[in-house]
Amino acid sequence: MLIPCWDSAGQIHHLEGFPTSFKDWSRGEELSAQRREFLSAVEKVTPSSISSTRDLAVDMNLTLEVTLDDGQVLVVRQCYPSQNDDVEELWRTSKFESEVNLMQWLEQNSRIPVPSIHSVMRRGTDSPAHFIIMSKLPGQVLMNSHSLLSSLAKVFALSHLTVRNTVLELFRLDVPQRIGTTIPSNPGDGLDVRPKIGKQYSLSADRVFDTLEEYMRHLFSLKRKSKSIGDGDTDKARAYSTLTTLEDLVNVHLKSLTSPSLRRCVLMHDDLHDANILVDIHGNITGVLDWEFHSIQPAVLAVGYPAWLSYDDTNDPRFASSSVWWVVGRQESIELRRQYAMIVKVKDLEYYEALVAGLFLRSVVNWLIDEHADPGCLRLRGWMISEEALGESLTQPDQIVPAK
């Protein structure tokens, strides 16, 4: 399916959207020994045999849509085992267990449309890998559907995302007031906190953080160790200088965030992009997927504009990696962001205040966790220079200044 995408010059192209399937299989067709072993393990916990599969995702996890002989359609998500790396295996297992627990907790404690988990299997005698079997939710991924929605439906999708389904409910759920990734509480049916699981095991935290200041110091430390800043002495020296300047600015900014409502810890989906949201033709949000990366963070970091509307920081066309594309044009993104800000301002003033107050800090975090190559932090430095010129407009969501 071709969808409109914009390049850094603002030119529109029609590119392949998120695949509806990477590979289809039906009974009678050839299977690898590894896939045959895995499907046999799945069939041990399904009510009937598997007649066909579709590979929905194949990168960090294997996600299959399976059709059974009795007509049921389910989703199976396999956690790939690590290849002889105990540290990576612990990371993979930890995010699998955390995702399972959080999805079950959200189904019991919220109205957020997460898939219902039918079965959980761990690697062992009966299974070659950890996997879960879930219900299949209706709808299409927003990445493929957004351009097909009417202007009214796009605004309705923002309203539905905030008010009825995800964002504002996450903002108000009762969660522990420490910074990290969730684990089951013991005893009880609540949540506890473990060190934050990163999108790569090398980016995970080694402890739980009590304050926003501690967490920001951790992120700066990770960036200084990141391969993205370059390997040479010159690149590292330039990067360290830029990061020190930015950290000094952040420390000053943190002193202005005095309201307890801005520092209250909030549950957030760390990967809430347009391929992890399902919508119908009217803009109703029908599913929120892929909770393996989530965290509890201060409100100023946990809130934000929808990721697919971003032309900021690492998505600013002047400084973005060459691999970045945009699924919404700049002018439309400005209008939809304005609508989003208006919606949350009416529905939850504290959310809106965190949205405004945290705009600069969230941009900094996006740069610190970005793993695209940036030797010497030259892209980051260019953004810092441009942001200084914007002045007070950094914190005004209704006055978004487009890039020149």
Swiss-Prot record:
SUPFAM superfamilies the record matches: Protein kinase-like (PK-like)
Tree of life domain: Eukaryota
Listed InterPro entries: AGP_Transferase, Aminoglycoside_PTrfase, Kinase-like_dom_sf
Pfam families the UniProt entry points to: APH
Free-text function comment from the UniProt entry: Part of the gene cluster that mediates the biosynthesis of clavilactone A, a meroterpenoid that features a unique benzo-fused ten-membered carbocyclic ring unit with an alpha,beta-epoxy-gamma-lactone moiety, forming an intriguing 10/5/3 tricyclic nested skeleton. ClaR, ClaS and ClaT are sufficient to produce clavilactone A and the function of claY, if any, has still to be identified. The biosynthesis begins with the prenyltransferase claS that transfers geranyl pyrophosphate (GPP) to hydroquinone to produces geranylhydroquinon.
Name under which the protein is recorded: Clavilactone A biosynthesis cluster protein Y
Species of the source: Ampulloclitocybe clavipes (Club foot)
Lineage: Eukaryota, Fungi, Dikarya, Basidiomycota, Agaricomycotina
Gene name linked to the record: claY
